[in-house]
Swiss-Prot record:
Cofactor: Mg(2+)
Residues of the Toprim domain: 3-136
Swiss-Prot/TrEMBL catalytic activity: ATP-independent breakage of single-stranded DNA, followed by passage and rejoining
Lineage, top ranks: Bacteria, Bacillati, Bacillota, Bacilli, Bacillales
Keyword DNA-binding found: yes
Active site: Y310
Protein name per Swiss-Prot or TrEMBL: DNA topoisomerase 3
Amino acid sequence: MAKSVVIAEKPSVARDIARVLKCDKKGNGYLEGSKYIVTWALGHLVTLADPESYDVKYKKWNLEDLPMLPERLKLTVIKQTGKQFNAVKSQLLRKDVNEIIVATDAGREGELVARWIIDKVRINKPIKRLWISSVTDKAIKDGFANLKPGKAYDNLYASAVARSEADWYIGLNATRALTTRFNAQLNCGRVQTPTVAMIANREDEIKNFKAQTYYGIEAQTTNQLKLTWQDANGNSRSFNKEKIDGIVKGLDKHNATVLEIDKKQKKSFSPGLYDLTELQRDANKKFGYSAKETLNIMQKLYEQHKVLTYPRTDSRYISSDIVGTLPERLKACGVGEYRPLAHKVLQKPIKANKSFVDDSKVSDHHAIIPTEGYVNFSAFTDKERKIYDLVVKRFLAVLFPAFEYEQLTLRTKIGNETFIARGKTILHAGWKEVYENRFEDDDVTDEVKEQLLPRIEKGDTLTVKLIMQTSGQTKAPARFNEATLLSAMENPTKYMDTQNKQLADTLKSTGGLGTVATRADIIDKLFNSFLIEKRGKDIHITSKGRQLLDLVPEELKSPTLTGEWEQKLEAIAKGKLKKEVFISEMKNYTKEIVSEIKSSDKKYKHDNISTKSCPDCGKPMLEVNGKKGKMLVCQDRECGHRKNVSRTTNARCPQCKKKLELRGEGAGQIFACKCGYREKLSTFQERRKKESGNKADKRDVQKYMKQQKKEEEPLNNPFAEALKKLKFD
């Protein structure tokens, strides 16, 4: 009997699919049943070949050998996962297999994972596509009942290949050109470089910002009401101190007369459902989680616990076909503290409205929402619980009615000047009930603070007991943190020097710099290549990042290039542009970039050279700030030796409770804190033992230290090798 091979992206998803399809016979890298064979990738099993596979001379990085422009780019099996590739290959080549079902992630990159495997195996069998947004049993069954023809996704595959090949031509050539021309470990890409440029621009704005003092007037009445002065244009601030001084002087011994009380009934609706970027932003703001950490937690909640839908989505809407499943999802997530809220929503039929249901705004995947799967809170880690809580509360909030309130604006006259006060009466808590009325609005910028207003009628006279001048200073723009950098990457149009509205709109519609799936990796890569560094929560550009921006061609610094690329990649995905035309343009652009770098007369200055020499090659080591602490890195890119000087650990200072830094090597290692606390590693081991009631032994501490090491950047990987593996998305 003929069988179908199903290719999943990961073993965990493969196991779920195999269970539903009753494939319980275990093989080497696959699971088999009577009709289906389920096998899996491990992310990418196949990638574009390294430059030296085209010509042995490319093994060495020489400026004169650039640009590298092979006619056709070849595919190669990734060595580390070669065993699994062979397992997939053997199943695809089986004579009893007459059909391939692509069940990798539903999106551009997922398409590439499976199709590159199929292309490398050189197999020509009919292809079908499983396109689902969650891996619950129901979603898998429904998906297999509605398989799509593989041909429907040929253009999406072409778009993915075009993106990958363009990154190879431009990314590898630009990186080699910069590194060899300036004798420094420099890498750039169409997303990385404009992201660094945005951080640099923000720092320039802060540096050039000149604070101005502004003035206002506040009056206090005997019935504890605070009145705020406003000019004829409704402004509460003035930069003219003399003017404010004069007004305050002229108001002496005047009372306030109530001119009008304006009552307006207002509504505010819940913020939209989460896409990945919005969730990463909120998790960073509320819990300090990095973008990468949030994605990893989401992946567990999606794959392992099966309680949330596909995480790598850029949509904040659901499609109309999902509306019918909402009651089941509410029943599944409506347990524990969410039970009363879910019960309230289920009392009435759910009304789909455009604020969260819009087919036109859902492409590959809908917004992140709960699945119909059983929720076992006891299986969650603390971090998983927090992320799950964010998603469920947002899901419930969207299904709750609007927050309704009556806004009262009190307009009074003191002398010839207008003073106002503002208050609010809640009519219906609506969706704010989900957040126990503690939801904070980021967009509230009103100068006039709301207060509890006493009973007042129009025409009343209020006794003024105090009139005082207020003052403040304008603030410089805030430095980026991971939350705000994600926002800037998602919508970089304000940083673009272009009058092309269509291009700006495309960047906005295609999700800005990078994709929801790649932004976390890009930010991580910028930290690990020492172009940016973290001080507290703030992100700062390093000297290396500054110099890189000075050395790269101008176009690579602007989001415009990404806008143009995304416009064309979208056209390829829609069948409106040939992949070959796009790649030809990219090759020509590569020639221009390399030529510009070659002819540059600029210099790169290592201003972080330490007194230490590299133990491998003897050259001076550079001192850099990694994401987890200080490191020494060999300045020779071909050597690439790295050594930790200190790293931030999860151990807490017993005095101030901040994270401790671990410095030194071996038995001489010492924990240090910014508050001045110091503790030897041996003393730390003893303290941990006592705190845990003498249960901790040497093995426990070694396990703890091993966990810390796992969180470090990889050490002593030759930089050239690392660059080869970089994806310049």
